[in-house]
């Protein structure tokens, strides 16, 4: 990124509508690399730092010269991008051609370019001289859409802007797709990878490191937020390597089922039954794996104190919680916590069902649903929960709007948000004070993305208050090992450990290699000093003016500080004076610390900020039937 641009914004105010300094500095780099030199870029910015806005601002700037195709994982994220594109158009202070920007979900883009599962090569010519932006780039490859991207790259020779906060999803092999899309060289990945017997033993060899450095040189933009911009994190539980883990010791009832299931499982790391029983037990496997039959049972006994009737769980076990050591710890703990909770769980066979009835029976009410037994309250409101799974994608945005609303800062509307892997995508959660992992994530990428949904810039009004993180592991009743090193156990020893502990160790092994490669990528990130790129000059000046008039309500039209600031970009007295006259005559929009939303006006020999409000009559619509006639109804 352009460090000279960063240094223009010392003491930057970021609590007003604005483009952040690091975003401007990155835009400069993207223009020089992608637009000027037709090179691809990996935008490796840690989650929560504003990759989406950077990509959309870049798309707007280059839309004057090229068509831009933006691919996102699904329709929900497409809606997020469309909404943010409107924000970007309000922020950017330059011309653009909005018709040249096309946003597609990967499924829609695939269907546009395939006929009967065969690529329509004749139609690909329309992508000549364009730029592709790929969101969640680490997830788009390894399928038909990824194959199509490779074809377009080879046929059309177009550059790609790849967005990723975690370019390695599981092992270094997943990075190979990103390398191939950014390179014209043929790469034999068997030459650069050391394959172990286990997934976590796959590592990049010395040749692989060399290939990485050569191919991605000058093609990486890395950025992470400063600690002062985020709340501190307090991990709870027992020391476990470089973190803490809560050991949730099983009751005899859960341990019996757990051991039986483990004996029956082959390749248990990928066995949904192990994930299920580490969360909660719901009777014999033949029942738990046949929920469609179980849901029609009448008063079916699962355990002496737990029954199911027409899909409804009831019985003392839902409050005693011998069926789940994790939920016993969770329910015992949340009564003493304040603020909103985000709870990640793997949506395996019966996770959502158990969660719902445990919460209801312990006094927590379902948002827009059933009221809990002896309902618990907060400030006169029910303490409520919501469960998010992939099946409810259509209503997720409405739910998150309520969860993130200022009126829910302390959980007055929704206190507990349970979510499966869908929340590892491009969503933002605000004011979350307690984060729970009911299921151990499979990868470092997944773990980071779940944390990154909440712990991000602008998600907290007060960053001085910490965020609590609870990583829960189901363990045997007599298990109390202190694990300080990955060398504490052999591979054979690891296989005898509780499933969650084994999964944690596998996660940490993969994390070690992932961090090594991320360090290499970070070192490849390019920083330089230069005057702003010509296509970004107006944008940089616009942000400087916004910052200046945040502090100043009235200045002389010949104000020395204003002149010096603008002239630092133009280095021309005549151009500087013309620019100051232009922003005044055009009534440039600013946010002032006293008058808030304002427009610039000239009053005699001064520039003043004039506050404004947009007024409208409720239920009044203006319909443009034709250019000459407007009708108000």
Curated annotation (Swiss-Prot):
InterPro entries, alphabetized: DNA/RNA_helicase_DEAH_CS (IPR002464), Helicase/UvrB_N (IPR006935), Helicase_ATP-bd (IPR014001), Helicase_C-like (IPR001650), P-loop_NTPase (IPR027417)
Pfam families the record matches: Helicase_C (PF00271), ResIII (PF04851)
Domain Helicase ATP-binding: 32-185
Intracellular or extracellular location(s): Virion
EC number(s) recorded for this UniProt protein: 3.6.4.-
PROSITE patterns named in the record: DEAH_ATP_HELICASE, HELICASE_ATP_BIND_1, HELICASE_CTER
Tree of life domain: Viruses
KW Zinc-finger (keyword) present: no
GO cellular component: virion component
Domain Helicase C-terminal: start-end pairs: 326-505
Function statement: Acts with RNA polymerase to initiate transcription from early gene promoters. Is recruited by the RPO-associated protein of 94 kDa (RAP94) to form the early transcription complex, which also contains the core RNA polymerase. ETF heterodimer binds to early gene promoters.
Protein family per UniProt: Belongs to the helicase family. VETF subfamily.
Protein name: Early transcription factor 70 kDa subunit
Organism the protein comes from: Fowlpox virus (strain NVSL)
